[in-house]
Amino acid sequence: KAQYILAVMYENGEGVSQNYAGAVKLYRLAAEQGNAEAQNNLAVSYATGKGLIQDYVMAHMWWNLANANGNKNGGINRDRIAEDMTNADIEKAVAMAQECFNSAYAKCGY
């Protein structure tokens, strides 16, 4: 939870200099521990390209995981971004989410 809170601070420049790459690093650490809010925010970073290279497949994967872990925005955002993706990319993202989840977040597409 602390990693997630610090990531939000980095993303928004609250009490620290704004640092999107730093936020992404912390979101990823929290996301890999199953934090659904961090998974959602990491997906937003992938979708927007803030702090890393834009990647809709990775965004879809993390939103899928966030949704599975109880973050309602994850499902909403996943479905929205899917409208701009090919079926092949959606299938890839779903398979990656399954592998990530089944590996206890050890194999998450990077």
What does each of the following model-derived ranges do?
Residues 1, 5, 37, 58, ...:
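Start-of-helix register in tetratricopeptide repeats
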Residues 3, 40-47, 53, 57-68:
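Short N-proximal segments of mature Sec-exported proteins
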Residues 3-12, 16, 26, 41-48, ...:
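Hydrophobic face of amphipathic alpha-helices that form TPR/SEL1-like repeat modules
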Residues 17-29, 53-61, 88-92:
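Structural signature of tandem alpha-helical TPR/SEL1-like repeats
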Residues 29-32, 65-68, 102:
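Conserved structural position within tetratricopeptide repeats
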Residues 72-110:
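Terminal, low-structured helical/coil segments at or just beyond the last alpha-helical repeat
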